A protein has these predicted regions:
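Acetyl-CoA-dependent GNAT
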Residues: 1-39, 46-56, 85, 104-114
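A short coil/beta-turn micro-motif at the C-terminal edge
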Residues: 20-22, 67, 95
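Residue-level recognition of the GNAT/N-acetyltransferase active site
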Residues: 33, 37, 66-68, 93
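Short glycine/proline-centered loop/turn elements that form peptide/ligand docking sites
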Residues: 46, 68-72, 89-94
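Conserved catalytic-core motifs of GNAT/GCN5-like acyltransferases
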Residues: 62-64, 82-99
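Conserved active-site tyrosine of GNAT-family acetyltransferases
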Residues: 76, 81, 101
Length: 114
């Protein structure tokens, strides 16, 4: 499974892990330590994993995010993801819907160069 780790002064501050099958990829988890959020770590990790997946022939990437996680949803939108569905009661503790997002790799590459 492809992944990237972000570090600052020898401390892990974030990571992203994904998987790919044929021409589709899925981001399984992207996390950044609270004190390093809103500093570009998450967007850097997201761009890196999308570029890697694209280099492996992936043309579309999917992920799920909690409906209430506005910060993560904004990050994913910046990376080129768009809502394509909803999974009712997907998460537990608390029970909550997941928003299914999709990004086309060519669109991501174009927006990342701006």
């Amino acid at each position: 499974m492809p992944f990237f780790v972000a570090a600052a002064e020898r401390e892990i501050v974030g990571y992203v892990i994904a998987r790919a099958a044929a021409d589709e990829g899925e981001i399984l988890n992207l996390a950044v330590a609270p004190q390093f959020r809103r500093r570009g770590v998450g967007s850097g990790l997201g761009r890196a994993i999308l570029e890697l997946l694209g280099s492996r022939g992936v043309t579309a990437v999917y992920l799920e995010v909690r409906a209430s996680n506005a910060v993560a949803r904004a990050l994913y939108e910046q990376l080129g993801f768009r809502e394509v569905g909803r999974r009712a009661n997907y998460y537990r503790r608390p029970v909550e819907d997941a928003i299914l997002l999709r990004a086309a790799i060519p669109a991501v590459r174009a927006s990342a160069k701006l």
